[in-house]
UniProtKB/Swiss-Prot annotation:
InterPro entries: BIR_rpt (IPR001370), IAP (IPR050784), Znf_RING (IPR001841), Znf_RING/FYVE/PHD (IPR013083). SMART domains: BIR (SM00238). Zn(2+) binds at residues 145, 148, 165, 172. One of its GO terms (biological process) is regulation of cell cycle. The lineage of its organism: Viruses, Viruses incertae sedis, Naldaviricetes, Lefavirales, Baculoviridae. CDD domains: BIR, RING-HC_IAPs. This is Apoptosis inhibitor IAP. It comes from Cydia pomonella granulosis virus (isolate Mexico/1963) (CpGV).
Amino acid sequence: MSDLRLEEVRLNTFEKWPVSFLSPETMAKNGFYYLGRSDEVRCAFCKVEIMRWKEGEDPAADHKKWAPQCPFVKGIDVCGSIVTTNNIQNTTTHDTIIGPAHPKYAHEAARVKSFHNWPRCMKQRPEQMADAGFFYTGYGDNTKCFYCDGGLKDWEPEDVPWEQHVRWFDRCAYVQLVKGRDYVQKVITEACVLPGENTTVSTAAPVSEPIPETKIEKEPQVEDSKLCKICYVEECIVCFVPCGHVVACAKCALSVDKCPMCRKIVTSVLKVYFS
């Protein structure tokens, strides 16, 4: 199947486009491809579908109105973020080191400690919040990301910390490095379409069912040589630039400004994928 992320491919779908006042070029340029029925089009990136076009309407404005979180609408490099199974071992995610906005909370353990007086009624546990990069400010349910300084409050019981971090601060380097572009794009795409009157949205928190003991499998242990040289827990998957040492996990990589191996200043990091 042709790649509909490409404008040229989308344009080819408008061969029998029936709307004279909106050119195929305009529609394709705004991320849409023609579904081949009536005047229905779909965004190749967020999957929102729009129909019943009226003269004078602006495809770009309508796209933003109905799917404000669409990565195409927001100008994210959606084409460059797709990873295929054929080239994953050669794929890297690059982030320039700016430094954490709150160095005091660069380490996960410090973020966990900040939640010592976190309201007990909150469904989000301190470990979950800290893992997603947040520390507690000490007021209400106000939290902030240690790296991008993004603040979130008014947490709902069903809110997942990582998903909320992505939805509101998708450009955060910590988010991009730890979760990866595929996860970021997935969360954004799922959130970008506004619920319609026929859309059912689940608000219930997931319920964990007990797993029979016989089905529990031990996770394979990481070889000592591959353990992060900062936390000694996670696997090394980040390469420091310019020295080239792969000695840190994604969570720890942004907590240091010097390579722990050679002590050279780190200017950027690369997330590496091993086949």
